[in-house]
Amino acid sequence: MRSPARVLNSLTKHSQTTEYRFERLYRILFNEEMYYLAYQRIYAKPGNMTQGADGETIDRMSLPRIEKLILSLKDESYSPQPSRRMYIPKKNGKTRPLGVPSFDDKLVQEVVRMVLEAIYEGHFEDTSHGFRPHRSCHTALNAVQKTFTGKKWFIEGDIKGFFDNVNHDILIDILKERISDERSIRLIRKFLRAGYLEQWRFHGTYSGMPQGGIISPILANIYLDKLDKYMKEYATGFDRGNRVRAYREYEVLTYQKRLVMRELKTATNDVERKVLVNRLKEIDKARSAMPCFAPMDGNFKRLKYVRYADDF
């Protein structure tokens, strides 16, 4: 039985070949050590002690339970339970729906998440910052600060109700571009269709994926990576020019500054030097109040893009 590190490293290595198709992913779910690692990763996270629809928490793990879970995966009798829907308050006074999976589903989802991350993480665009290792809303804000400083036009987008409206068929088709393993695809579809319980009433899910599901963030990034790559391609056709034209008034002041500095080097008395220094201060003040490049240069265009989850 291979260690989880070797399994995941092998997946990452194969994923570097764009044409490679993964055919036997499902058997990774038969590796007990993958569940030990999954347990370690999710045990200490806030919220994982919350009861799912089965009324059990993650501290009830045992080897016999894992063995039973693996057997149900082998014969594909495993069926995810509906998540328990609860509502989390937001800063604006509204609430956000959160689906709490059962204990067994958390374990299986974490194993699937690790597998998908090993395959896809290296192919996501640098413009994507949500739900990724070593990335966060802070790295997204830093990217905005560095990339958008001095820009005149902004388009802010929020995909309304994204997690509730993801098209399952489109998502499955995207997964099939790299995964040629029907059992793995069927398992992911089971998670998407598991539904949820709200006030002990079952609701089917024919689109979307539950916020709170462990595999939902990686599936969201796989889905929205198409948007990221489209924007990258669109920017290639949108961008124009190699260098933005300098602002004429700024260039004039820069030339005047060079002349004054040249005179300052040859000034012979304090009165003359004081006059020139004051002139330099006036020029610098005027320069700082205007852009150094033409703000609306029609011959130079750039499109920049940053995404965090369903906000871009």
Language-model-detected regions and their locations in the chain:
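Non-catalytic terminal/accessory segments
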Residues: 1-312
